[in-house]
Structures are given as structure tokens and as C-alpha cells.
């Protein structure tokens, strides 16, 4: 089992016993009945005691959207910030305060529309923040417009004749930005969700988690193919590092590389065992993880969940601290007043 304290070496540790109740605020939870956000919140609150971090050293930053109400409901420091800018704010916190465990809560609209630029650069820089993207493939807060992840042809209030847009694949986007940790999970699979949260907390650097989240009001059953017991075994591909990739009701299907480096589903029994894929989440080159992400399709025929990529590299805050320390050793402590005064000043008159 991963140790969610490992990436928190500079964050204070508490020996005080914590429970889920300690991380519940006094605020009334105000999401629509049946919203998948309730399940995510409960899993998150029940996981937080594992971090053994004092509440005052835990910070949750969100943008704008239904999911972004989550900081109100967790008894810690938090910030309900500007639309799309949560990764930028979290970057400043994580880079300047390594004694904090910083989590970002965002949605498919907040992160991938107005916030897309901030998201990819936080991932590229490998800032030590954990980003949870609640993907319901719709704008819920503004009452049901299409989002950057809505499928092509989606009829909504803002696309009455069907969306013309090709949707973002959040996993492909994160891997393309060379995020060092990329995973997907589902709101209704609490055990899997908690396991992914644990692994993300254990990772030093930026962690990106896409969570399929059902919106029962404006996009109900958007992920029914991968959540209903009657269909999920045929379509969900569970990724476990070092394990053969098998799926299907009887585990009879596998994956292998086809032409041009793409992955294809094949009958495992009728294939050369050496050609079948064993999952390697630790591959340094992101090409393999990207190929996995391209299995996605609008009908969820083959949908991997789990950790796609877990390839550690130095985090931005570590590199920044080392650079500052080296500069201090070479030039001494800085003088802010002298810096502001500058060397090229003069008086007039």
C-alpha cells in the first residue's frame, strides 16, 4: 500500500487521531439530490485522516462551478477562487509554502475552458499540487449548457441542434502536458476512488485525477456504460501497474499494440501471450500512457480507469527552493528595500 505521507516531507505531522468527522465543516452541503459530488466529498473526507496532516496545513483551492463548492464543506483552509484560476493560485501556495498540502478542485468547464492554460502549465511545471477534475460533461451551475468534454452532437440549451465541437479528452490533455501523475476514477466506486487519492497524495509533484461524476439533473447517466453492473465489466479496463491488462466479463480480452503504435483490443486466448500488454505506469516516456488514453471513445467501448502514468521527476517547488538557496550562498541574503530603490535613481530639481 502506498504511503500518502511520503510526498509531504516538509508538511507538519500530527499524532492526534483524526476521523472523517474532523474534516466536516458546519456548512450545509448544497448540491442537487443524487449529485455525484456527494460521493466524491464523502470519499475525500474519509481519506484525509490518512494524510496525518493538521487541518491548518491543508488547503483546498477551487474555481467556479458546482464542484468548486467543495472547499466550503471541508474543515480546513480553503479558497473559492476565480473562474479557471485555481491552478495558478495553488501554484503560488505550493511553491512558497512547502509546509502545506495543496489540493485543487475543478470541473470540466472550469479547468478545460477558461482555465485550460493554467491547468496545462501547472502540470508541465510539475507543481506539487493534487488536481481533482470532476467531469460530468455538462455545465451544471449555469443550468445545462454543453462543456469542453460534451460529446459531439450533444443537444443542450446552448447547442439546440447538437454540438459541433470535438470534445477534449482530459487524460490525453494531461499526458500531452507531460504531467507526472495521471489517473481516472469514478464517483460511485469509492474503493477505487480512495485508492487513487492515496496514490496521488503519495506522489511528489503534480497529480491529475479525472473523476467521472454523474449530474442527475442536466446529464443523467452520462457514464452509465461504465457504471451499470450490466455493462461495466465489458467496457471498463482496470489498470494495475505490473499486471496484465485484461477486461471483459470473463477477463477474456487484452490489449496489444497495432499499426502506428495504437492499442487495440484482442481476444486474449487467441493471441500470442508475449504480444499482450502488461501495464507500466512508471514508463518515463509518456507515449505509452497516451496510447492508453486514446482508447477512449464517445460510447465508452473501452474505458481505462486507474493510474495511467506515475513517473516522478523533480517538483517545481523543490527546484525553486534549491535555486533560491544557491543564490543566497553565492550572493547572500537579499535586501528588499535596496532592490526596490534600485541602483539607477536620481533626483530632479
Locate each region found by the language model.
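Flexible, low-complexity linker and terminal segments
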Residues: 2-17, 26-27, 217-349
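Glycine-rich beta-alpha junction loops
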Residues: 64-66, 136-138, 189, 212-217, ...
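Conserved thiamine diphosphate
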Residues: 19, 147-200
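Short beta-strand segments
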Residues: 61-63, 105-106, 130-135, 210-212, ...
